Amino acid sequence: ISWLQNLDDYALPDYSYFPSIDLYMDQVITFLEKQLQLIKIDDNPILTSSMVNNYVKADLLEPPEAKKYKTHHLINLLSICYVKQILSISDIKFIFSYLVKDETQSKKFYQILQHTYQNKIKDIQNDYLKKINQINLYNSTNDEQIAANLLQLAYDLSLEAEFKKIVAAKIISLTKNYDNKLDDKKSLKEIKKEQKKENKKNEKKE
């Protein structure tokens, strides 16, 4: 319960808090590890240099400049870490292609993320602190029943998370299909333009 009560301690920093100077890889890892403590469950690192390099290779993250990373690199890495257990790299890349096209968009995206994050923390505190307190209150003398009810709550949360994951996947899939149709239309227009050019050339020859 104390962990839930102290969720406010894990608030995401304001954009102005990010370093104004470019950082080397080890500095990036150190800075972001502090910001990602909320999702750290065990002793395994949340972010490593090899992960960052893989994101660059996958075109999910822009390459560093002279081995240094800028603010938008940090923001994008933070955004990746929060959803990488839910979304595939290709899906995150697709989302970024719409929402994080440049540094200006990256800043706006982070501000929306920060706002959503804070609201979700409040929702979680309001909803689940009440439920946990009710479990403890109604079963105050039965430790086994408390454990069973808490595990049932954990299972229900997992099920809810899975349903939300499915909805997110469906939305991304539908958007990808729409995106492909747009590409097909563009390709069709290009083909028609080329055909018109060829027809004009042939008419001139005749």
Where is each model-derived feature located?
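Basic helix-turn-helix/winged-helix DNA-binding cores
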Residues: 1-100
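Intrinsically disordered, low-complexity, charge-dense segments enriched in Lys/Arg
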Residues: 95-98, 102-206
